[in-house]
C-alpha cells in the first residue's frame, strides 16, 4: 500500500475543517493507546508491518460493519481531489475557535488581575479603608458603572442582579507545616575514620626522657602505666653532585632492621620537594595500623 501510494504515514497535523488546522493528528484509533510506528529496522521493536496490518484490518472491519467505501485513501489524494474541484471557501476573519477558551479568543484579563490584587489588600478585605477608597476599589472590579451583557449583535440583553443568600466565602489560602524531630549534638560531628573528636582533654605533665645522639634522636614519653610513647628521628644527609646523569640515575636505598616483636616501621608522612626528600617513620604496635 505504501509503495502504491494508497497508504501514508504523516508526522504532522492533517485535519481539514472549516476552522482550519487545529493540531489534530491523523489517526484510525480513538482510544489513544496506539503504539508508535517504529520504522528503524535496527530497533528491537520494529513494527512497520504490524502497524500496516492493523490499519488494513481496521479498514476492512469498518467497511464490513458500516458499508462505507474509502474513496480517498491518503491525505495527499484527498487534498489533490479538493484542489481539483476548484472550490473557493469564503475568507474567515473572526474567531477560529469561538467555543474554545484559548488565550487569543477571550478578552484580556490583565486589568481584572490588577483590580483583584488591590482588592486583596488587608483594608479592602476587612473593610477598614476609607469610604471613598472602598468605592474606588469596587469600581475597579467592575471597571465601568455602565457594564452590561450584550448578545452576538452587540445589543444589550435585559438582565437583573439577584442577591445571593447564605453565601459563604471559602478560605483565601492555607499553610502547610512540616515538623521534623532531630537530636542535637553539641559536638557537631562524631568521631569517625577521618576525624577524631575526644570526649574531653587530659591535663598533666608527662615524664620525658630525651636521648640526643649524632645520628638518632629519641624522646621517651610516659603518660601513665599503660600509655608509653617513643618518638625517634633519624636524619640522613647525603649530598650528591659533580656527576652526569645522562647515562643513568642515582638511587638511594634504606634498610631498617626490625624493631622487635609486634613492632613495625610505617611511613606516616612524606613530602617530596626539590631537595631534600623528607620521610617520617613512626613505630606502630597495632597490626591494623601497618
Swiss-Prot record:
A Gene Ontology annotation in the biological process aspect, one of them, is: mannose metabolic process
Give the UniProt keywords, A-Z: Glycoprotein, Glycosidase, Hydrolase, Metal-binding, Zinc
Q: How is its activity regulated?
A: Inhibited by swainsonine but not by 1-desoxymannojirimycin.
Q: What class of enzyme is it?
A: hydrolase
Residues annotated as glycosylated are 64
Q: What EC number(s) would the UniProt record show?
A: 3.2.1.24
Catalytic activities: Hydrolysis of terminal, non-reducing alpha-D-mannose residues in alpha-D-mannosides
Any idea what job this protein has? Answer: Liberates mannose from p-nitrophenyl-alpha-D-mannoside.
Q: Which family does it belong to?
A: Belongs to the glycosyl hydrolase 38 family.
This chain's protein is named Alpha-mannosidase
